[in-house]
Amino acid sequence: MSLIIVLVISVLSADAVLSMDNELYLNLEPSQRSSWPVARAVRMQFSKRSEGGRESRKMQGCQILESLNDIAREALRTPRHTTKRISKDEMEFFEGRCLSVGESERTVLGTKWCGAGNEAANYSDLGYFNNVDRCCREHDHCDNIPAGETKYGLKNEGTYTMMNCKCEKAFDKCLSDISGYFTRKAVSAVKFTYFTLYGNGCYNVKCENGRSPSNECPNGVAEYTGETGLGAKVINFGK
């Protein structure tokens, strides 16, 4: 199931006769390579004119966004109360009005690990924002339950990979500890996209029979917290 959201911003001219509507349609789909969703968005601009009590609307521009960095930037500057959900058919209608685009980056700009999958050549390969990338790399290799699989007695019946809550907390802390003005911009994009826009929730593991001398939890039982973000809630709805 896909998530479709429309974020609407209206900018009125001084005489309120002509206005510009900027609409962002967002589609999140499951990734087979990581816990991150594959994000796709369409930003469209319409001019709206009101004359003699009648309104007319004309498309002025269209852009398909596949970069998490661009999508996060658009979502961050859009008031949350203007977020609306539309149907998949409506999304396909607007996509059909845009020109096809080639493959776009699916990681946050300046990183190789922060996104659906990764662009790294090897484990040591990091992007420009290497400190942010280290956080994402560790998160990618942390304890998880892939979609459809069972671990700790918990079956992941959702669409996305489910992460251990300890991994989510460590990821959030790792990002929060990063300083630097420009780096913080990348941190904001990563945190907003993953925790707020997506928000798949996580699972806690209880060691009912205690831990082993090596601190392992061989008979652990996991409990899912439930989705925390609008993206995961809509996509997993009805599963």
From Swiss-Prot:
Residues 20-105, 211-213 form a propeptide. Its cofactor is Ca(2+). Keywords: Calcium, Calcium channel impairing toxin, Disulfide bond, Hydrolase, Ion channel impairing toxin, Lipid degradation, Lipid metabolism, Metal-binding, Neurotoxin, Ryanodine-sensitive calcium-release channel impairing toxin, Secreted, Signal, Toxin, Zymogen. GO terms for molecular function: calcium channel regulator activity; metal ion binding; phospholipase A2 activity; toxin activity. SUPFAM superfamilies: Phospholipase A2, PLA2 (SSF48619). One of its GO terms (cellular component) is extracellular region. The keyword Secreted applies. PROSITE patterns: PA2_HIS. The keyword Hydrolase applies. Binds 1 Ca(2+) ion. InterPro entries: PLipase_A2_dom, PLipase_A2_dom_sf, PLipase_A2_His_AS. Residues 1-19 form the signal peptide. Expressed by the venom gland. It catalyses: a 1,2-diacyl-sn-glycero-3-phosphocholine + H2O = a 1-acyl-sn-glycero-3-phosphocholine + a fatty acid + H(+). Its main location: secreted. It is found in: Secreted. Heterodimer composed of a small subunit and a large subunit; disulfid-linked. PANTHER family: RH14732P. Toxic phospholipase A2, which may catalyze the calcium-dependent hydrolysis of the 2-acyl groups in 3-sn-phosphoglycerides. Inhibits both skeletal (RYR1) and cardiac (RYR2) ryanodine receptors (calcium release channels). Probably blocks ryanodine receptors by generating a lipid product. Belongs to the phospholipase A2 family. Group III subfamily. This is Phospholipase A2. It comes from Hoffmannihadrurus gertschi.
